[in-house]
From Swiss-Prot:
It comes from the Bacteria. Binds together with bS18 to 16S ribosomal RNA. Keywords: Ribonucleoprotein, Ribosomal protein, RNA-binding, rRNA-binding. This is Small ribosomal subunit protein bS6. One of its GO terms (biological process) is translation. GO terms for cellular component: cytoplasm; ribonucleoprotein complex; ribosome. The keyword RNA-binding applies. The gene is rpsF. InterPro entries: Ribosomal_bS6 (IPR000529), Ribosomal_bS6_sf (IPR035980), Ribosomal_S6_plastid/chlpt (IPR020814), Transl_elong_EF1B/ribsomal_bS6 (IPR014717). GO terms for molecular function: small ribosomal subunit rRNA binding; structural constituent of ribosome. Belongs to the bacterial ribosomal protein bS6 family. NCBIfam families: S6.
Length: 95
């Protein structure tokens, strides 16, 4: 298992329920894929450095997890098909 971090930005038009539902959805993908979540860090609503998809702000969330090498591909697929995701990145922690 490798250690990974993902940061994703959700659309600012979401209410608190919608935001929490999306975070739980992504956590579920990690856990159902055999991953172990180490930390969920909610940064909250922040201004973007530049406009993305016609929005200037979004809800930032960082998740640190351990998983097999195939899980990040599935998580990336779920991020891509979720309309409320403005931007995301998954990186392997080399520490």
């Amino acid at each position: 298992m490798g250690k990974y971090e993902t940061i994703f930005i959700l659309h600012p038009s979401l209410d608190e329920e919608g935001y929490k539902a999306n975070v739980e959805k992504f956590k579920g993908v990690i856990e159902n894929g055999g991953g172990v979540i180490e930390n969920v860090d909610i940064w909250g609503k922040r201004k973007l450095a530049y406009e993305i998809k016609k929005v200037n702000e979004g809800y930032y969330t960082l998740i640190t997890f351990n998983a097999d090498p195939t899980l990040p591909k599935e998580l990336d697929r779920v991020f891509r098909i979720t309309d409320t995701v403005v931007r995301h990145i998954i990186v392997k922690d080399e520490k």
